């Protein structure tokens, strides 16, 4: 096996273990044993478990962002863009279940990038620009676009997590319900929202 092939093998083994057990519960011993190599081989390629985990997470983030960015950059109407973005996330969850499980688990302590929260922030900042333009067109305050972007992306991401853990509904139905809530909620935004219940 070439060095490159060995590296890919270790990434595949690590990805599966991180998805099944999480970062903390996975050991270098386990990774090397499943790959049929000695521990020094893992250290040689990645410097340790943290390095392997970082490569796995970076690949998963790139794959997910690629799908969502493609959906968001298409020159479509707002609803179609929302439908494509929700479908892109659900497609990723369906085709890369292990990858999504890794992304939604907590990152190792002290790691500020490569977490699900940072991924959500990246996607939300892209959505923010789309919403700001739509808000201006509808004479709503574009300064609230970051807030709505976080809410919208969070809703889709958390629903994706729920669907992964209990896939009783078809993917298309989940996407349709997501878009229904998001679109109809966005379609009726108040210019100056207020709470009606007194505190």
Model-derived features: where do they sit?
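Amphipathic alpha-helical packing segments from all-alpha helical-bundle domains
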Residues: 62-65, 112-136, 146-151, 173-176, ...
């Amino acid at each position: 096996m070439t060095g490159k092939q060995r590296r890919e093998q270790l990434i595949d083994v690590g990805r599966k273990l991180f998805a099944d057990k999480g970062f903390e519960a996975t050991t270098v011993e386990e990774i090397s044993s499943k790959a049929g190599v000695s521990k020094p081989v893992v250290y040689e390629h990645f410097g340790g478990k943290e390095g392997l985990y970082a490569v796995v997470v970076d690949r998963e983030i790139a794959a997910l962002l690629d799908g969502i960015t493609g959906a968001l950059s298409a020159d479509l109407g707002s609803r179609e863009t929302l439908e494509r973005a929700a479908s892109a996330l659900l497609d990723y969850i369906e085709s890369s279940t292990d990858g999504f499980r890794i992304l939604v688990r907590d990152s190792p302590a002290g790691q500020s990038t490569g977490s699900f929260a940072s991924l959500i922030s990246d996607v939300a900042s892209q959505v923010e620009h789309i919403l700001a333009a739509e808000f201006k067109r509808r004479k709503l305050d574009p300064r609230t676009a970051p807030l709505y972007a976080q809410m919208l992306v969070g809703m889709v991401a958390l629903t994706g997590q729920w669907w992964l853990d209990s896939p009783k509904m078809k993917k298309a139905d989940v996407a349709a319900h997501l878009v229904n809530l998001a679109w109809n909620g966005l379609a009726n935004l108040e210019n100056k929202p207020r709470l009606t219940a007194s505190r």
